[in-house]
């Protein structure tokens, strides 16, 4: 009886998140970018071995590239391929999106940061955002607000 009512839990579509980016920047405008990956990288992402902590987006010659993202190779990866965990990966964006990103970075002083990696219809996607850096007092204010909201939720749950 108990087994029939339980549903199998679907795997999460999110592979990795860049929490550091959410803490250090005001995220303004988000874009969904595809990634040019090798076979071993897709396998390691399926195993959840992606890391965006030190990653950033570099705009060069009308193209966007993901630098510093670590995709740890699996032990069972191919022997004839030499995997490089921190290689530069090209981001795939539409021409208009690239124009908006370039304009935001060059004219408006935004920074382009990767926010998360996720699966969409079997393809690995990277959520990138145009962001402004937070000052120290902004970070403190965000932390205080988060703590205050947690305290409010605790009080409401106890009633």
From Swiss-Prot:
<keyword id="KW-0963">Cytoplasm</keyword>
<dbReference type="GO" id="GO:0070929">
    <property type="term" value="P:trans-translation"/>
</dbReference>
<feature type="compositionally biased region" description="Basic and acidic residues">
    <location>
        <begin position="140"/>
        <end position="150"/>
    </location>
</feature>
<protein>
    <recommendedName>
        <fullName>SsrA-binding protein</fullName>
    </recommendedName>
</protein>
<dbReference type="GO" id="GO:0005829">
    <property type="term" value="C:cytosol"/>
</dbReference>
<feature type="region of interest" description="Disordered">
    <location>
        <begin position="140"/>
        <end position="159"/>
    </location>
</feature>
<dbReference type="GO" id="GO:0003723">
    <property type="term" value="F:RNA binding"/>
</dbReference>
<dbReference type="InterPro" id="IPR000037">
    <property type="entry name" value="SsrA-bd_prot"/>
</dbReference>
<keyword id="KW-0694">RNA-binding</keyword>
<dbReference type="InterPro" id="IPR020081">
    <property type="entry name" value="SsrA-bd_prot_CS"/>
</dbReference>
<comment type="similarity">
    <text>Belongs to the SmpB family.</text>
</comment>
<dbReference type="Pfam" id="PF01668">
    <property type="entry name" value="SmpB"/>
</dbReference>
<dbReference type="InterPro" id="IPR023620">
    <property type="entry name" value="SmpB"/>
</dbReference>
<comment type="function">
    <text>Required for rescue of stalled ribosomes mediated by trans-translation. Binds to transfer-messenger RNA (tmRNA), required for stable association of tmRNA with ribosomes. tmRNA and SmpB together mimic tRNA shape, replacing the anticodon stem-loop with SmpB. tmRNA is encoded by the ssrA gene; the 2 termini fold to resemble tRNA(Ala) and it encodes a 'tag peptide', a short internal open reading frame. During trans-translation Ala-aminoacylated tmRNA acts like a tRNA, entering the A-site of stalled ribosomes, displacing the stalled mRNA.</text>
</comment>
């Amino acid at each position: 009886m108990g087994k029939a009512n339980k549903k199998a839990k679907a795997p999460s579509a999110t592979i990795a998140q860049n929490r550091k980016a959410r803490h250090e920047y005001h995220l303004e405008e988000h874009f969904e970018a595809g990634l040019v990956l090798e076979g071993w990288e897709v396998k390691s992402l399926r195993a959840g071995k992606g890391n965006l902590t030190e990653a950033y987006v570099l705009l060069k010659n009308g193209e966007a590239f993901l630098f510093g993202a670590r995709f740890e190779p699996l032990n069972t990866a191919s022997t004839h391929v030499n995997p490089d965990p921190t290689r530069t990966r090209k981001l795939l964006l539409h021409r208009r999106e690239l124009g908006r990103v370039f304009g935001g970075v060059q004219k408006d002083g935004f920074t382009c940061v990767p926010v998360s990696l996720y699966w969409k219809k079997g393809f690995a996607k990277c959520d990138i955002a145009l962001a402004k850096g937070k000052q120290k007092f902004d970070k403190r204010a965000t932390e205080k607000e988060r703590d205050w909201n947690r305290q409010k939720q605790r009080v409401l749950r106890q009633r």
